[in-house]
Regions:
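Basic polycationic patches enriched in arginine
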Residues: 24-27
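Short glycine-rich anion-binding loops that position phosphate/pyrophosphate groups of nucleotides
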Residues: 84-86, 171-175
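N-terminal active-site beta-alpha-beta segment that forms phosphate/nucleotide-binding
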Residues: 18, 30-162
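Redox-cofactor binding/interface segments in oxidoreductases and associated redox assembly factors
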Residues: 80, 168-169
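Surface-exposed, charge/polar-rich loops and edge strands
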Residues: 14-18, 30-35, 42-45, 49, ...
Length: 211
């Protein structure tokens, strides 16, 4: 199952998308990708804090529903992200997943040397519920870390093929489910390495929809 969870003020609407569309987004309204990113981020930034919090809470509630419907198989692992700026915030979902006994992982950017060595720009590291404030890659999600900079015994890498669900950030999406990211290509490289059974879920507000 692959879907985008979209929040409106009073409802949640899941939209099926095609994984092959990730990383490919048609130009919208005569804009190039950079212009489109700026325009959509500005629209998202314009949401006041209370509205953004309400929308994020609604998104997380829908994610918890998906979590509950994923079956009793254990152990399970889910990757989320640490929200930056005005992004939809999956923190409440991450807490709920941990309470359900799921292993929760966060993106950790690789150093240039490690990127060359493994062919990926990021990995997912497991973080126990009480350790989130101590994880440097959560505090600084865009910073690159050498393997020796992170305590791998405390924050072990979760192999991509071991993930059962991944929650993906995005800038914009359209009615076909195509996703526009931030332009770094990290998820474009990472997502194809996941198990075919992994649920890939992009979360956004309806203000980020571009048709």
């Amino acid at each position: 199952m692959v879907c985008v969870v979209v929040s409106t003020f009073d409802q949640i609407k899941p939209t099926k998308i095609n994984l092959s569309l990730f990383g490919r987004f048609e130009r919208g309204a005569g804009m190039d990708k950079a212009e489109l990113r700026r325009a959509v981020i500005a629209r998202r930034d314009a949401l006041d804090l209370d509205m953004r919090a309400a929308k994020s809470a609604a998104v997380c509630a829908r994610l918890v529903e998906l979590l509950g419907g994923s079956g009793p198989v254990a152990p399970r692992a889910v990757a989320v992200y640490a929200a930056m700026g005005s992004e939809a915030d999956p923190a409440a979902f991450a807490a709920a997943a941990a309470k359900h006994g799921w292993r929760v992982a966060y993106p950790c950017m690789f150093s240039a040397a490690d990127t060359v060595a493994c062919g990926q720009r990021m990995c997912m590291r497991a973080v126990a519920a009480g350790d989130a404030s101590e994880a440097p890659f959560i505090a600084h999600p865009t910073r690159a870390f050498a393997a020796t900079d992170v305590d791998s015994s405390r924050f072990p890498i979760v192999p991509a093929e071991a993930l059962d669900m991944i929650v993906v950030p995005l800038v914009a999406f359209d009615h076909t489910g195509a996703r526009l990211g931030y332009g770094g290509g990290c998820y474009d490289r990472y997502l194809p390495t996941l198990s075919p059974a992994c649920q890939i879920i992009g979360i956004a507000f309806d203000e980020q929809r571009v048709d």
